[in-house]
Amino acid sequence: MKFVDEATIKVDAGDGGNGVVSFWREKFVAKGGPDGGDGGDGGDVYLEADENLNTLIDYRFNRFYNAERGKNGSGGNCTGKRGEDITLKVPVGTRAIDIDTGEKVAELMTHGMKQMVAKGGWHGLGNTRFKSSVNRAPRQKTLGTKGEVRELRLELLLLADVGMLGLPNAGKSTFIRAVSAAKPKVADYPFTTLIPSLGVVRARGNKSFVVADIPGLIEGAADGAGLGVRFLKHLERCRVLLHVIDILPIDGSDPVQNALTIIDELEQYSEKVAGKPRWLLFNKTDLLLEEEADEKINEILEALAWEDRYFKIAAVSRTGTQELCDELADFMDTLPKEIQTEEEKAANKVDFMWDDYHKDAMSGKDVVTEDDWDDWDDEEDDGHVIYVRD
């Protein structure tokens, strides 16, 4: 199946049903009082994470989704039926962005997680709600509100512990083939990897972690060059980044400049991603003598002023790969779990429409008054009638 990690959809929550103006009619009870019922709420739109899905391809073909409208109220204090909700299944790791506002509406991280993305309209109030000691025959009602309409960009972010980045042909796919059962395509031309791939790595002590291989970056990727930043988003949930550097590029380019290009693109994309723990992997060390490889690596480290961890590997022969994986597994055990701060929770809170609608309605705002009533004498008044046998 084709891998699709981004799709645009339009969701339309159901409108609320209208309240009704009605009066009780019964033999020998000339003035039975108001009995208009409320309308029903409109249906909501939800997203639900499903571990059995791994692509958003279904939403490329069907982009429009509508929840059901609430039914209108009726006489006899009968409330209208609530509109049916609609639930859209998406892969685990999907987030929804409101295209118009840029607001993150939902982020689904675990199987079965369910979040609302569009709220149905509130029900209108019947005239019974407006009855009081000074208003015995209210002719006021409120209309149901419109359901929310949102245009959403669905983004599937891979859930991986370790993310790999580097220029095309740096050896990222070869590395993931060496340390896991994943078999991404490997060839001697740029952009062999066109879609992300995941591999499960087994380390010592029965430890394991997931590594993600994304397509290579080039200069200007943050501005859309090459495959752009479309796949950089998959690094946002990684705990550690592996920056793969080819110490002997086939095109004769400078490894230092290549490394600086990746660092610059990462910082332009996101300060948060750029601030994640990042290790350097010097690949293809088997193409040089050990002394020559060490000399070139030291030159790169000095030029980058690098003081963090680095490893020398040869992915094609698996030299140094197992030691690296063991170190990664131990290092991730020391990392604290990401805890969302109160500020981040407040920033991620989604405000839906109509939260204060009924409070405003009862205060007189948005009230509709039916002025064509003839008090109690109109035989066509939509009143509720009960026939009683003499």
Swiss-Prot record:
Its cofactor is Mg(2+). One of its GO terms (molecular function) is GTP binding. Gene3D superfamilies: GTP1/OBG domain, P-loop containing nucleotide triphosphate hydrolases. Keywords: Cytoplasm, GTP-binding, Hydrolase, Magnesium, Metal-binding, Nucleotide-binding. The keyword Transcription regulation does not apply. It is an enzyme of class 3 (hydrolase). GO terms for biological process: ribosome biogenesis. GO terms for cellular component: cytoplasm. It is found in: Cytoplasm. InterPro entries: G_OBG (IPR031167), GTP-bd (IPR006073), GTP-bd_Obg/CgtA (IPR014100), GTP1-OBG_CS (IPR006074), GTP1_OBG_dom (IPR006169), GTP1_OBG_dom_sf (IPR036726), OBG_GTPase (IPR045086), P-loop_NTPase (IPR027417). CDD domains: Obg. Mg(2+) binds at S173, T193. Residues 160-333 form the OBG-type G domain. Its main location: cytoplasm. It comes from the Bacteria. An essential GTPase which binds GTP, GDP and possibly (p)ppGpp with moderate affinity, with high nucleotide exchange rates and a fairly low GTP hydrolysis rate. Plays a role in control of the cell cycle, stress response, ribosome biogenesis and in those bacteria that undergo differentiation, in morphogenesis control. NCBIfam families: Obg_CgtA, PRK12297.1, PRK12299.1. Monomer. Belongs to the TRAFAC class OBG-HflX-like GTPase superfamily. OBG GTPase family. HAMAP family: GTPase_Obg (MF_01454). This is GTPase Obg. It comes from Aliivibrio fischeri (strain MJ11).
